[in-house]
């Protein structure tokens, strides 16, 4: 009863302060659920209540729950080596100033490369329209990567992202500095080493853990 009261108080106050519109709290001890309760709504318009069937976008945590997890699995299988340079896995980086950096330094955030690149800023022209070879509102063979029902990505846009990363600058090479740019490259590394698509490789890991609701592109399933 005391646990229930404490959790209720914390979540209700946090929702009232608009830290988030809703939440699901699950506490498991010794393999048993001792607390499982839903609070609030999906969004601040209060239209859809949080339920046990709610699915969450874990956003930047994907770096840990899919990319890093995949590299750990490949490392266990003796397919991925921390002491190898980036160019060992991605030949396209061979003649760049990023190519000789060890992958372990990317994972330790010791490369000194800037934290991120706002790729979206380069996708529109002065009139606010999408530039060629970026996005389109309708599906076609050239714009085949589904993002939303009205937004599709150019199939070779990954090359543009890679080029930005190749050309980006270093901020500080003498200290630990967070950078998420390496994680744009992990899916291709995983695919090359595993001979599977990144989505399928990660999906196999999740399936082995009975994480049936942890996946990419949930609208395909739910």
Regions found by a protein language model. Give the residues of each.
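Residue-level marker of regulatory loop/turn positions in helix-turn-helix DNA-binding domains and
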Residues: 3, 59, 178-179
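Short, solvent-exposed turn/loop segments enriched in Gly/Ser/Thr/Pro and often Arg
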Residues: 29, 62, 86, 177, ...
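Generic hydrophobic/packing signal
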Residues: 70-75, 90, 107-114
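Short, conserved catalytic-motif segment at the N-terminal edge
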Residues: 2-56, 79-81, 162-167
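Active-site SXXK
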Residues: 11, 25, 31, 55-84, ...
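Short, well-structured active-site flanking segments
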Residues: 34, 45, 72-91, 192-220
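Short, surface-exposed loop or secondary-structure junction motifs
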Residues: 98-222
């Amino acid at each position: 009863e005391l646990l229930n009261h404490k959790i209720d108080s914390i979540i209700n106050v946090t929702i009232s302060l608009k830290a988030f519109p809703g939440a699901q709290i699950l506490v498991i001890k010794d393999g048993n659920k001792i607390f499982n309760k839903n609070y609030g709504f999906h969004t601040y318009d209060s239209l859809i209540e949080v339920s046990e069937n709610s699915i969450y976008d874990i956003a930047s945590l994907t770096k840990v729950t899919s990319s890093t997890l995949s590299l750990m699995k490949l490392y266990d299988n003796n397919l991925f080596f921390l002491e190898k340079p980036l160019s060992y896995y991605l030949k396209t980086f061979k003649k760049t100033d990023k190519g000789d950096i060890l992958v372990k330094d990317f994972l330790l955030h010791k490369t000194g490369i800037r934290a991120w690149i706002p790729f979206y800023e380069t996708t529109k022209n002065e009139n606010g329209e999408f530039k060629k070879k970026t996005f389109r509102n309708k599906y076609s063979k050239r714009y085949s990567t589904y993002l939303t029902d009205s937004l599709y990505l150019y199939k070779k846009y990954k090359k543009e992202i890679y080029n930005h990363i190749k050309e980006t600058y270093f901020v500080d090479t003498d200290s630990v500095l967070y950078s998420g740019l390496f994680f744009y490259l992990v899916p291709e590394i995983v695919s090359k080493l595993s001979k599977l698509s990144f989505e399928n490789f990660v999906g196999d890991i999740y399936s082995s853990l009975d994480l049936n609701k942890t996946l990419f592109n949930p609208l395909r399933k739910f």
